[in-house]
Amino acid sequence: MLIADQDVQRALARVSQITSSLCELPAVPTLDWLDRAASCIARAADSGVVVIALASADEQGVLSTRDAVGVAASRDRSPAEEAALTSLRSRAHRLQGAALPFRVPSSRDVLLGRMDKLQANWKEGPMGRLWNGHVRGDLICAVAPMSYGPNQAILVCLDATASGVDPAALMAAVMPLLVRFTSECLGPTFDNPRNWLTPREQEVLDQVALGRSVRQIAETLGRSPHTVHDHVKALHRKLGANTRGELIARALGHLARGVSAEHEGLAPREIAEGGLPAPRGGARTLV
């Protein structure tokens, strides 16, 4: 049966776009991972701004944010609007440790709704300090527990304007996938974002995944072999990889952190020849 309702068609198309972009997130933790994730969720509105933050939950489920945030807009912004985004990012970082007006669901459910419905006086608390002067439309927030470890949670806020499709419904549809990818990728280093890959390490990892040697990578990137070697050592340490094969497998999302190729029953030769298990996070991309 054909779907005649244009609103439904638009909603399905938007969910498909967001899902596709989420599947393109790196399979390894990078310093810009949350920014990229925020950019994916921003597609839920024709014009909107997204803030994503990792958070810890106490025994009562009360949230406090950590110094790991991502900020993005759904479209290109003017210089003044870019400055506003920078200000919002700065505020989000300063929010670290503040108790938020949410309680994390005890199961893998998602708490989602418009901010004025979740808490009537939200403007008087930390969320008000974060969004003061930045809200132009409906502020929609979602909170969900991460599956990797206890007391880990993710907070997503979308200031949505000029949207032809209900952005809250779109967020509800894609939040489970975002939570899954965030848990798999950032969960193991939740307490230590310093182990997330820098832009230079991402460049080197891309080259390693192409099968290039240290010398070839140095020539391609215009750096010394010694510098590239240091980056490769850092990649092995940060991603917990013992071999180059494991490093590539982690980069492609075929091997979870803390699991060795031997544990998966794969020999280095099998990795080199493509005998890898299916990616845990779907079709993932290089960083």
Predicted regions and their residues:
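Short alpha-helical "packing" element that flanks the helix-turn-helix/winged-helix DNA-binding module
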Residues: 201-208, 247
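Short, locally clustered residues in the helix-turn-helix/winged-helix DNA-binding domain
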Residues: 209-210, 252
